[in-house]
Amino acid sequence: MKIFFSGSIRGGNKYRRQYGQILAFLQAFGETISEHSDRPEAFDDGGLKGDAAIYARDTHWIREADLLVAEVSQPSIGVGYEIAYAEARNIPILALYHVGAESPMSAMVFGNPKITSIRYDSLSELWPVLKDTLAETHLPPK
């Protein structure tokens, strides 16, 4: 299973440290094809030249994905766009939301029946729920 992980980069990096832990967890279930989200160079566009190159790279990765997992605790137009892009291509979507986040989550995400939303208080609380949810996706294993 190919997993595209989406998390705020330019919109804020409060949850950046958690991205790495979530990515490491997801690697047990498949190939993560967007690990750039937890690397410092991602905040400098990962060495790509210009916004068009980043758009082309990320949309290519999403089209290649079997699943999109988005950490949505930090509001981000880019993450919302990636979610909509995946939805338009019938790619399953999991949205992870930290209940202690400063901003409430958009009803456009939590109200969407095509998106599986998981609220969590701590990463240790998230792991078993995420594991069970990934098992229920019935996507090809790693």
From Swiss-Prot:
Residues the record lists as binding substrate: F4, F5, S6, G7, S8, I9, R10, Y19, H36, E82, S106, A107, M108
Secretion signal span: none
Family annotation (SUPFAM superfamilies): N-(deoxy)ribosyltransferase-like
Keywords, comma-separated and alphabetical: Glycosidase, Hydrolase, Nucleotide metabolism
InterPro entries: 2'-dNMP_N-hydrolase, DNPH1, Nucleoside_deoxyribTrfase
Keyword Ribosomal protein: no
GO biological process: deoxyribonucleoside monophosphate catabolic process; nucleoside metabolic process; nucleotide metabolic process
TM regions (residue ranges): none
A Pfam family that the UniProt record links to this protein: Nuc_deoxyrib_tr
Enzyme Commission number(s): 3.2.2.-
Function summary: Catalyzes the cleavage of the N-glycosidic bond of deoxyribonucleoside 5'-monophosphates to yield deoxyribose 5-phosphate and a purine or pyrimidine base.
Assembly mode: Monomer and homodimer.
Record-stated family: Belongs to the 2'-deoxynucleoside 5'-phosphate N-hydrolase 1 family.
Protein name: Putative 2'-deoxynucleoside 5'-phosphate N-hydrolase 1
Organism this protein belongs to: Syntrophotalea carbinolica (strain DSM 2380 / NBRC 103641 / GraBd1) (Pelobacter carbinolicus)
The organism's taxonomic lineage, starting at the top: Bacteria, Pseudomonadati, Thermodesulfobacteriota, Desulfuromonadia, Desulfuromonadales
